[in-house]
A protein has these predicted regions:
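Alpha-helical transmembrane segments and membrane-interface helix-loop junctions
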Residues: 1-168
Length: 168
């Protein structure tokens, strides 16, 4: 096994770990949503904090889940065309799309850092009374999520390149 393959495998193990944690966030989100519905319709009461917790849980699910989805090939692909390509062309497309994903990740990380730092500097919280006060923590997940997406895209690029090179 080459060092590049070991790196790609190590990234996969890490992303799978993150994916398992993200799955538990999904379970927590389902519980919170169920409790909110029960409180609202069963007891005619609600909690702003619990409502905000729903999207505080949804954000890491989306931001961390996109790397897990990429790892397991669950991202969107135009299979009508892709299915007819040779394996070598599929690998080439994999390399190109991984590089594009990495570039987009770098752009999002770069653009979000000042946004996150500003949020931390002002101690940004919710405008809703009784809501979750530490919104800056949630915003910090944006560059983290795209960093995870970057490293998983790197693993995909490595694998596609090695397959493309060996098929040539």
């Amino acid at each position: 096994m080459t060092p590049a393959e070991k790196l790609a495998d190590g990234i996969d193990v890490f992303i799978d770990f993150v994916g398992r944690i993200t799955a538990w966030s999904s379970f927590a989100l389902a519980l919170v949503m169920g409790a909110n519905v029960l409180m609202r319709y069963g007891f005619n009461t609600g909690s702003i904090w619990a409502q905000e917790l729903e999207w505080h849980l949804m954000s890491p699910i989306c931001l961390f889940g996109m790397s897990y989805a990429l790892r397991h090939g669950e991202h969107v692909r135009v299979d009508v065309l892709y299915a007819s390509f040779s394996q070598r062309n599929k690998d080439l497309i994999g390399i190109i799309t991984a590089l594009i994903a990495m570039a987009i990740s770098v752009i999002v990380i770069d653009l979000s850092i000042s946004y996150v730092l500003q949020s931390w500097n002002i101690g940004e919280g919710t405008a809703n009374p009784g809501g979750i006060s530490a919104r800056y923590i949630l915003k910090s997940l944006i560059p983290i999520g795209f960093a995870l997406f970057f490293i998983q895209s790197l693993a995909e690029a490595i694998r596609c390149y090695l397959a493309w090179r060996s098929a040539g």
